[in-house]
UniProtKB/Swiss-Prot annotation:
Cystine bridges: none
GO cellular component assignments: cytoplasm
Keyword tags: Cytoplasm, Histidine metabolism, Hydrolase, Iron, Metal-binding, Zinc
GO biological process, one term: L-histidine catabolic process to glutamate and formamide
Species for this entry: Aliivibrio fischeri (strain ATCC 700601 / ES114) (Vibrio fischeri)
Protein name: Imidazolonepropionase
Entry's Gene Ontology molecular function annotations: imidazolonepropionase activity; iron ion binding; zinc ion binding
Record field: transmembrane: none
Subcellular location: Cytoplasm
Binding site for N-formimidoyl-L-glutamate: Y144, N319, G321
Annotated residues for binding of Fe(3+): H72, H74, H242, D317
EC number: 3.5.2.7
Length: 408
């Protein structure tokens, strides 16, 4: 054993059939043993695992959870859209701002102008808030380049971030985020570029784990999204989708039928769409930050998701326009207060279900033997406090592959 954590109160998030507990129950006076970055022992204090003089970390009865996973972010961009925030407060709809060249295309212009190094330094600064909230894995999308070179530039930045010792990264190609201005009224030709040039080159450079699309009236049609999904799958990439955020185009059912790991936003998802998620074991990712910033009133169908036992993930959707929130714990609180999730559902949403949304459920999101040793150590008494309390520095340390990182 390389390192042993003792005197901790564990919230493992491991399934009940595997442990006899529900994963949310606090297991007091627990010990975790780590070897080569993996969990090798979890359980009651066991003197025998202290043989060999491992590094012993006394957690002093702190609460330990899996490291948090922010499974949907747009972390890499230049500029900001505070002016659009003001416009929306004056009553101008998001769709109208987008049609006038604002929205995503505003950020596209700024991001195209920025160098790779500039984008990297901006993104690393934004990570700090997420680290303080216990995040050990982050998903990062492209989607503000919308050309071959600029999408690759963004994904190269994400790859550089993945080389940091204290943050794991899952990368997503989101070239189908918006129609770039040079392809106005020629969106099918832009889809050709994505399928025939961008996806093959991204695969050649090994820059992405997933391909995502924005299936919406101001984005791309289900038929266009299906083409992108098929090209991604043909090149060995996994898929996910921004679906049913502003209307119901049945994009969630399409994505699920093609094997998507998750569909995200889903405010307008109906029962047929929920059934498709259940049939295909697709995660529903809730993004209350965007719901809040856009002052939406249409709630995701939480009762239906519960009825059909759909795993619900939660993410920041961190982006400059509709969710500039670099705090996953704030999002957990919003999921409870706005979407009426329980604190347990909220915690599952940023651990085991977030891992599943990225296809990482066999490696992260739980504290169990064989899983990667990623967890967060909190000065808290109960897991409900993670959703309940905001703005208090409760995090003692993050552990990534067994290595300890104390936050400032």
């Amino acid at each position: 054993m390389d390192r042993v954590f003792i005197n901790l109160h564990l919230v493992s998030m491991v399934d009940k059939q595997q442990t006899g507990s529900d994963g949310y129950q606090v297991l007091k006076d627990t010990m975790i043993g780590v070897r080569n970055g993996k969990v090798e022992y979890v359980g009651e204090p066991c003197p025998s695992i202290l043989h060999g003089h491992p590094d012993i970390i006394d957690c002093a009865h702190a609460l330990v959870t899996p490291g948090f996973i922010d499974c949907h972010t747009h972390l890499i961009f230049a500029g900001n859209r505070a002016n659009e925030f003001e416009q929306r407060l004056l009553g101008i709809p998001y769709e109208e701002i987008a049609k006038q060249g604002g929205g995503i295309l505003s950020t596209v212009h700024a991001t195209r102008e920025a160098s790779e190094d500039e984008l990297y330094h901006l993104a690393v600064q934004r990570l700090e808030g997420l680290k303080r909230d216990g995040v050990t894995t982050i998903e990062i999308k492209s989607g503000y380049g919308l050309t071959l070179d600029d999408e690759i530039k963004m994904l190269k930045v994400a790859k550089r971030i993945s080389e940091l010792p204290d943050m794991k990264v899952s990368t997503t190609l989101l070239a189908a985020h918006a129609v770039p201005p040079e392809y106005k009224n020629r969106s099918d030709e832009y889809i050709d570029l994505i399928c025939e040039s961008i996806i093959p080159q991204v695969v050649k450079l090994n820059l992405a784990n997933h391909v995502d699309v924005f299936c919406e009236g101001i984005g791309f049609s289900p038929k266009q999204c299906e083409r992108v999904f098929r090209a991604a799958l043909n090149h060995g990439l996994r898929i996910k989708g921004h679906t049913e955020q502003l209307s119901n185009l049945e994009g969630s059912a399409l994505a699920a039928s093609m094997g998507a790991d998750s569909v995200d936003h889903i405010e307008y998802l109906d029962e047929n769409g929920v059934k498709a998620l259940a049939t295909n074991n697709t995660v529903a990712t809730l993004l209350p930050g965007a719901f809040y910033y856009l002052k939406e009133s249409k709630l995701p169908p939480i009762p239906l998701l519960r009825q059909y036992k759909i795993p619900m993930a939660i993410a920041t959707d961190f982006n400059p326009g509709t969710s500039p929130i670099a705090s996953l714990r704030t999002i957990m609180n919003m999921a409870c207060t706005l979407f009426k999730l329980t604190p347990e559902e909220s915690l599952r949403g940023v651990t085991c279900h977030a891992a599943q949304a990225l296809g990482l459920q066999h490696f992260r999101g739980k504290i169990a033997v064989g899983m990667e040793a990623d967890f967060a150590i909190w000065q808290l008494e109960s897991p409900a406090e993670l959703s309940y309390r905001l703005g208090v520095p409760d995090l003692i340390a993050r552990v990534v592959d067994g290595e300890i990182f104390h936050e400032k």
